[in-house]
Each structure stands twice: as structure tokens, then as C-alpha cells.
């Protein structure tokens, strides 16, 4: 192996070793299945202590790039184009460790529902139930921060308010919520880096978006919020929201009707719905850590060190070729416009389906965390087959091309073209497609459900490849 350790570098020797082996694996100079030199041999070749090499190998093993065979032997398991790349940035697409804890808690009245639903503790009505939900825009606010710092345009944060609200609203849609919703926003900022005008833009954006939702029939109202100055916790800004509502138990979409024999209708995440003000890239609010680092250039790491986790390996930080103002390939948008595109809500479409076609919807899945594999959490002994997906939108193609991320992993991190799935009888699929079309949102039958003898699993067709997820 061609490894050279610079003893005069400010980068620790173990990190230099990690970065160089990482590069050799990514460029396939070290191939999957190839046995690595022993720790002792690497230490001798690099002039390092054995414990320094061992520390580097543990880091590579954590990233999923190598696997220990014995006390000192390792085998290459693949490039970080798989799950290792996302995990190495401190992010989990499926939040396995979180779900392992939540599984032990009370699941509420309807254990298979998309959101936790409780008895009506607010009003005490036995025929009603409460739904409370919390979510946010994730690290998308950091991209807005970069854009603001580069341009001085504070209005970019208005879209961030929409992202945070939609991530709550569209989860609530999946349990059939169409009543009155109160939403509260939480802003955690580094006040030295994020002045008051950013907070003002976020609040204004929230109020404007809530007002626009009411104009299209969504009964959502502002419940105020909280702004905290927590510079020790964040170098930039974090935007989250919490929604609460009351609904009748008989109207809940419980998830129990997601069974074999259904059509899966995907609602496109791209284009421009007639209730949107601009073209949507489809990016949503998931996978933005990877999108930001894989697309944007080292320029942002050097100029804005407060915008990334210093614990992440240097070669995974802002390692892309683009600046925010650069054109996105195969798109009319710039890179900045594409990754800041506000998350689309499907509320007007779902509301109309619920009101005009009662019983048509058997289940709804918001393809947020876990993306196209989110469906695996719902139903029992189901084989989800997705063999007619939308072509990957330009923003996701660009991310894959610059990062060399495996397509199988892309479908676990990004929505890849549709962010809402409607599960319905096959002969009702055209109704869903027509209703979506009336809002200028593309829809298509992306797949179906069949019986499975081995628990829930997903077969996803990408070009000539078939990706398998689940047991």
C-alpha cells in the first residue's frame, strides 16, 4: 500500500492513516475482500506505534470499510459509498438505535399507526384521541446559513420554516389527520453567528407558510415558540417544530389495512405544484448532511468551520466540487437552489382524497427517515415491490455522481423522486393519480404489496438492478 505519514503535519498520524486507507478503498486500489497487512506490519512500514495503527483500524471498522478477522488481521468490506459514508458523518438513515429504545415504550392506541396516538387527555372525550408530533429541518438550516453568509439574503430562512413545519404536518397526514392543528417552533441558535434578523425571517416564514396552508384548506394555526441562545451546543442554528391535534378515533388511518394486494401510488417530490411558488428539486429535509458535504466544496469548510462537526474525518467534510451558485447538472436550478428547495407538503392532495373518497386510502407512508425503505416499518409479512419508480431527480443524480454512493444506499437516504406513498386498491390508483394531477403534482403506480413468508421485505428496481432490503 502507498501510505505516507507526514510527521510534521497538524493532522494526527492515526487520522492520516485513516484518510489514506479510506482513499485507497474508495478508488478501489484496495478491493472488497482483500486482506489488509497486519497491524504490526503496517506499523513497521509507516513508522508508527502499533496502538496508533490499531486506533486507525477501529475507525475504519466503525465506518464499515474493514472487518476484523482476528487480533491483527482485517479484510476490506467495501468503499464508503455504502452505509459507512453516512454513518461516518454521525448520521443514521434508519435510526436503528433510537427505534430499539422506542420499541420498549407504549406504542399508544394504534400500535401500527404512522404516529403515536394517545387517548384524548386534552379534552377527555372517549371518542377522540390526541396526536402530538415533533420534527425539524435537520441540517438543512446549515445550508441556509452558508447561503446567508455568502449573499446576505436572510429571506432564505423562510424556506427553512416551511421545511420544519412540513416534516410534522406530512407525518400527521399519514394517520388521517385533517382537523385543526396547532404548531409551535423551536429555534436553537448561536447568537454570535446568527443575528436577530435570522430569527425574524424564520418567524415571518412560519407565519406566512401557515397562512398559505389555510388558504388551501389546511386547518393549521401558530402556537408560538421558543428561541434559545445555545452557542455551546451549535455553531449555527437548529430549527424544529412540534404539532398537536385532536381527532376522532374512527377517522384514524391505523396502518392495519396495509396488506397484500394493494397498489402503491407515489406522489412526486419534484416540479411545481399549483400551491407552490417555485420549482421544487425534490430534496425534502432528509439526507441533507450527505447532500451538503458531498456536493459543496472545501471552500465552505475553510471559511465556515462552525458549520461542521470537527470529529468527522476531513476527507468527508465539504468534499464536493460545487459552490452554491454553480448550476446543477441537468437542471434549471443552481446547486444552492436545489438543496435549499423547500420541502413540499402533500396536505392539499391528501385532504381531498380523505374528504371526497372516504375509504380509498388504506395506508399512507411519508418517505422521510429511511426514504424508500420506510415502508418496511408498516404491515406484517409484506413483500413491498417497487418496480416503476420515478427517474431519479437531478439533485440526487448529482449527489450520487460526485460521491460514488451506491444506488442501493441512495434509496435508503433520499426520497429519490417521491416522498409520499398512497396504498390503495389497484382499481382506485387512477383516482389518486387524477387528484394529484389536479394540483399539478405527478403521481404513478410505483409498485405493489404481496405476501411474504419471511417478514417485511422490499424489492426495489433501479434500471437493470434489483435491490433487496429487509430480512
Residue ranges and their predicted role:
Residues 29, 64, 176:
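Conserved functional loop/turn residues at catalytic and ligand-binding sites
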